Amino acid sequence: MNLNGCWNGDSKHSRTGKKCLNQLGLKATTTLSIPVIVVGNITVGGTGKTPFIIWLATELQTRGYRVGIISRGYGGKADNWPQHVDSSSDPQLDGDEPVLLARATGCLVVVAPDRVAAGQALIAKEQIDVILSDDGLQHYPLNRQLEIVVIDGERGFGNGLSLPAGPLREPKSRLVDVDIVIVNDGSWEHKGAFRTKIVAQPVYQIIGSRQKSLEGFRNTTVHAIAGIAHPSRFFDLLEAAGINVIRHPLPDHAKPDAATLAFGDDLPVFVTEKDAVKCQSICHENVWCVPVKLEFDAENGDRLIQSILTNL
């Protein structure tokens, strides 16, 4: 292997130091018995990765694939790992995103800081055909058949600097080496990328059975709570639908409490899907979840799935 290429940021073989060590055989890597698709990003948080994993898992399932998901379970406080996550799991123990993924896809999700251990536990538990790794692009001990990067098309790479001075986890040249690039909303361009957008779905009461289109709240004033990496994306989505939004951003992965949802008025309270999995036990009847999904145009969606299946 070319050592210069390993460290040269302009080379198509560029890698971070960790990946270089893996490629040189100086750090152990593990290949699981079934294909692994890593869905990640090269910037910190908030690119639309979770909605894309939900979309991809659903598309693969409709084609007959048995899908499992592994995740780090960020924010989870379980004493032992790996943890098996399903729709009834506690997001306080296992993390909010894994529980959301389990509920949205029906897939078994296994969480552990060590993604190799998570993958092995998943295979031991369930008959599956493919593993989707939620994040883990930089977790190089786990070999992968396919790397997919999701980029926020509105923010791109920010100031273009690496952590902690900027948002980059890895150099921009890392995109040369991944298999597929997804650009979510915005105008950021990348040659060969698949473009998508986030679309709101009908909102529903967390406690109760009512559903309502987002347009049904046009010109209504609502409290909006978002404990996600970039809350403004959620608030902007609501405002684009003609809703008057009182913004209440929370830190990413924060757990709302009863006081968080109480504003002393009778205005509706809107929360993200990720927040909804954490606050079901403390909601009042005027708390509504705003689910979202990714949409590709028909041609791009089909072409993307074929590209993925070809690489498995």
Write out the residue ranges for each language-model feature.
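Short, flexible loop segments at boundaries between secondary-structure elements
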Residues: P251-K255, N286-L312
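Active-site regions of enzymes building and remodeling cell-envelope glycoconjugates
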Residues: I34, Q83-S87, C107, Q145-I148, ...
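A short, gly/pro- and small-residue-rich
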Residues: R144-G158, G166-E170, R195-P202, K278-A298
